[in-house]
């Protein structure tokens, strides 16, 4: 697996309606797929998430053994020792996937999309993966979003940011206060740690929302995406 590249990733792609000038990489949660995430978003919004100028890439994590499932095989971006914020990260698996997803970013750059026109984000584990990818390896992307996600207390992301002195991508973070799988307090802690390390970020909290996507959340995410990746008309205003 050490030599894995983006070629191992199945991907679901939603093409822009007009000229492609920006790209969005949207990472699913544990046990899901790129196609599954796209269909879930479509169900919540009652329509596909689409843009005039932004290509959306929904990759699928390659199947691997997952410790919280007693070693069962699942589509996960990395392994966890357990689902909590106070245990060590499984850095070996995180770093392998950072390289695989870096290859995916490089593919977009080779096709003519600048790094500052690429956004990375995800739901749950996908959001955690996006934060590792952007803040440890790609601090020149347009922005990062994390929906119902968290970082472990001693995360390698925090260690990387302590050594950083450049401009960091903004983080858009959302979390349901009723989430019982990934606690809202873990998201608050992640947000305050990143803020203290120089990341511009706001945590949007949603009362009565569990570990799920909500329409309100996706509506404000879409607006934020357009502020980070404006089309030609928006840039001229």
UniProtKB/Swiss-Prot annotation:
Coiled coil: none annotated. Palmitoyl thioesterase that catalyzes depalmitoylation of CGAS and KCNMA1. Acts as a regulator of innate immunity by mediating depalmitoylation of CGAS, thereby preventing CGAS homodimerization and cyclic GMP-AMP synthase activity. Does not exhibit phospholipase nor triacylglycerol lipase activity, able to hydrolyze only short chain substrates due to its shallow active site. Keywords: Acetylation, Cytoplasm, Hydrolase. PANTHER family: LYSOPHOSPHOLIPASE-LIKE PROTEIN 1, LYSOPHOSPHOLIPASE-RELATED. Belongs to the AB hydrolase superfamily. AB hydrolase 2 family. The gene is LYPLAL1. Pfam families: Abhydrolase_2. It is found in: Cytoplasm, Cytosol. One of its GO terms (biological process) is negative regulation of cGAS/STING signaling pathway. GO terms for cellular component: cytosol. GO terms for molecular function: carboxylic ester hydrolase activity; palmitoyl-(protein) hydrolase activity. This is Lysophospholipase-like protein 1. The keyword Hydrolase applies. It comes from the Eukaryota. The active site is at 124 (charge relay system), 179 (charge relay system), 211 (charge relay system). It is an enzyme of class 3 (hydrolase). It catalyses: S-hexadecanoyl-L-cysteinyl-[protein] + H2O = L-cysteinyl-[protein] + hexadecanoate + H(+). InterPro entries: AB_hydrolase_fold, LYPA1-2/EST-like, PLipase/COase/thioEstase. The modification N-acetylalanine is found at residue 2. Its EC number is 3.1.2.22.
């Amino acid at each position: 697996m050490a030599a894995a590249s983006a070629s191992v990733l199945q991907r679901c792609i939603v093409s822009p309606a007009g000229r492609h000038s920006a790209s969005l990489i949207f990472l699913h949660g544990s046990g899901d797929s790129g196609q599954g995430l796209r269909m879930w978003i479509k169900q919540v919004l009652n329509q596909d998430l689409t843009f005039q100028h932004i290509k959306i890439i929904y990759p699928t994590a390659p199947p691997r053994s997952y410790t919280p499932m007693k070693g069962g095989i699942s589509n996960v971006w990395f392994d966890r020792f357990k689902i909590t914020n106070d245990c060590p990260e499984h850095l070996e698996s995180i770093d392998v996937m950072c390289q695989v997803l870096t290859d995916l970013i490089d593919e977009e750059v080779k096709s003519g999309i600048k790094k500052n026109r690429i956004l990375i984000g995800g739901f749950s584990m996908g959001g955690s993966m996006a934060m590792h990818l952007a803040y440890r390896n790609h601090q020149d992307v347009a922005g990062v979003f994390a929906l119902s996600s968290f970082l472990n207390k001693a995360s390698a992301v925090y260690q990387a940011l302590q050594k950083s002195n450049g401009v960091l991508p903004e983080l858009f973070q959302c979390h349901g206060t009723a989430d019982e799988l990934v606690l809202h307090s873990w998201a608050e802690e992640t947000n305050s740690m990143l803020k203290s390390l120089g990341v511009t970020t706001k945590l949007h909290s949603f009362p009565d929302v569990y570990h799920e996507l909500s329409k309100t959340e996706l509506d404000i995410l879409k607006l934020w995406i357009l502020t980070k990746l404006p089309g030609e008309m928006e840039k001229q205003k």
